[in-house]
Amino acid sequence: MAREYSLLNTRNIGIMAHIDAGKTTTTERILFHTGKIHKIGETHEGASQMDWMAQEQERGITITSAATTAFWKNTRFNIIDTPGHVDFTVEVERSLRVLDGAVAVLDGQSGVEPQTETVWRQATNYKVPRIVFVNKMDKTGADFIYSVKTIGDRLGAKAAPIQLPIGAEENFTGIIDLVEMKAYEFDGKPEENYKEIEIPTNLLEQAKELRAHLVEVAVEYDEELLMKFLDGGEISISELKSAIRKGVINADFFPVLAGSAFKNKGVKLLLDAVVDYLPSPLDIPSIKGILPTGEEVERHADDTEPFSALAFKVMTDPFVGKLTFFRVYSGILTKGSYVLNSTKQQKERVGRILQMHANNRTEIEEVYSGDIATAVGLKNTTTGDTLCDEKGEIILESMVFPEPVIQLALEPKTKADQEKMSIALSKLAEEDPTFRTYTDDETGQTIIAGMGELHLDIIVDRMKREFNVATNVGAPQVSYRETIKLPGKAEGKYIKQSGGRGSYGHVVIEFEPNKDKGFEWVDKITGGRVSKEYINSARVGLENALRNGVIAGYPMIDVKATIVDGSMHEVDSNEMAYKIAASMALKEASKKMNPVVLEPIMNVEVTVPDEYYGDVMGNISSKRGIIEGSEQRGNAQTIKSKVPLTEMFGYATELRSFTQGRGNYTMIFSHYAEAPKAIADEIIKKSGK
């Protein structure tokens, strides 16, 4: 099957925004105009095409990046809809990783909002070219020029309008195209027809000034044009478009458009801008990867190169099973073929290849370089894995996901729920690399851990809706740890005689702190005093005991254990006895080793307008935080600090209240550190150990 659309006519784009900026509605309109939807779904009615999970429709927010393919003016779009809530930044991260460009949607009344800053920073990290769509121009208080200004002030980004709205609020009727100096009036119907009109006289001067500024900014990206401009030459429309495109592809310049997706105004012109200014897979740098020899190589968007792709999302579909979304960087993949998962060194068979539209799908025979598709049949592939040709093995740069920072206990309501719950949790953990689940050895409770309270709410909700599992949910908890500060040596001897065959296990173990190196086991038994089998049992027993700690019931980390002596009984020795003996040795030695409670310390980055800088610094210090520095970004300050997680519960609400919603923060696990005595005593008391 031949390639239907050339690489030049392919756009892999994301739609990114603050929650409630109208991103999903904008995506809806794009899908409507590109022929994928016959009836438009309104987000505020809970009927959107992209928001296909039940909770998304109920809450009116986008949680999962739904990938969809659409077509516009001989160009094929692969669109990824990204969530706008801070608990789902991992979804944004993984979609940005595989995109070539993005449309940033702003609210015409608010301009750049806190979550816009978070998502914008992530896009900047991945050097994603962007165009900006100022949406909701029909809204009361909408102000296009103010919104453009916030891009420079709050994001420190170089932006300039390429359109000027005609009117605002209920009088928003059309736009002036500043590149071609033409004006268009919208009819406001779903088909979004528009007609060319004269540029209104009251806006002509402003339009000329904005165009002159646009030309000045754009020619900087083309040396020949800059010389022509400085010599007083006239810059043609095609030259201006080409210069704007260069600035956009450099991820250095961000053209701004205006519209109202809800009122069917400006979305078709936005689609034209995606084609004109956002990059094709050929415009972006080739991807780097590592060969089995360790040598770094590049793979290009070329069908003749060996196949290489990155899995960026895994989902469970109730009808098809496991779906793996992947971006092809080089080569071609045919359905039914075998690929190598080079990250896990496992061979996988691609059963079917699907092209997705929200939650509908079309089966295709082949997928080409530069494209995004979904595979059915990959059993062991997870998010961030590289898929490649067996003969052209390569590992592409993967995605790094933050550790979960919040956990809570789940209990199934009935016996039937118990069985379904473990299946549901393993499937959900497979989909989401920032979600973990395990069983607490002491209480037997199932613990789930994730990125925030909303994140875990959604997980519990999905279990109920998709897997029909009813649960009782505990309060959120911090994941503490324990460690030792001094070395210690102890004997563990377990002898049990109860008529007939007894039990005998005897070990001597030396313990010492092993900072930042995890658990280490060393065998120094000589002369066969304890057999290898029982030494291994002692190790297993010790690891089990460490999982439950010695002072507060939390896992003990960073311990080196050396087994130095022991003995065996020719009849009564058994594996269980050595497991118990090792745990007895730990308990005994802990009396000398000064065990302590460790608490998780988070890297917290808070970005706030300058006027709130002092308040935030004081607030962080009051939370036992250590300020590591700050940097100016536009008219905002980003404060970097390390803060104990215990102090961060409810921080989103706190920050919102004293910055009027203009502050935002990111929080990622840094390390474990010893908890102050008063806090440790409280934790130990609560544990009842």
Swiss-Prot record:
GTP binds at residues 17-24, 81-85, 135-138. Gene3D superfamilies: 3.30.230.10, 3.30.70.240, Elongation Factor G (Translational Gtpase), domain 3, P-loop containing nucleotide triphosphate hydrolases, Translation factors. One of its GO terms (cellular component) is cytoplasm. Its main location: cytoplasm. Residues 8-282 form the tr-type G domain. SMART domains: EFG_C, EFG_IV. It comes from the Bacteria. GO terms for molecular function: GTP binding; GTPase activity; translation elongation factor activity. GO terms for biological process: ribosome disassembly. It is found in: Cytoplasm. InterPro entries: EF-G-like_DII, EFG_II, EFG_III, EFG_III/V, EFG_IV, EFG_V, EFG_V-like, G_TR_CS. Keywords: Cytoplasm, Elongation factor, GTP-binding, Nucleotide-binding, Protein biosynthesis. Belongs to the TRAFAC class translation factor GTPase superfamily. Classic translation factor GTPase family. EF-G/EF-2 subfamily. Catalyzes the GTP-dependent ribosomal translocation step during translation elongation. During this step, the ribosome changes from the pre-translocational (PRE) to the post-translocational (POST) state as the newly formed A-site-bound peptidyl-tRNA and P-site-bound deacylated tRNA move to the P and E sites, respectively. Catalyzes the coordinated movement of the two tRNA molecules, the mRNA and conformational changes in the ribosome. PANTHER family: RIBOSOME-RELEASING FACTOR 2, MITOCHONDRIAL, TRANSLATION ELONGATION FACTOR G-RELATED. This is Elongation factor G. It comes from Mycoplasma mycoides subsp. mycoides SC (strain CCUG 32753 / NCTC 10114 / PG1). The gene is fusA.
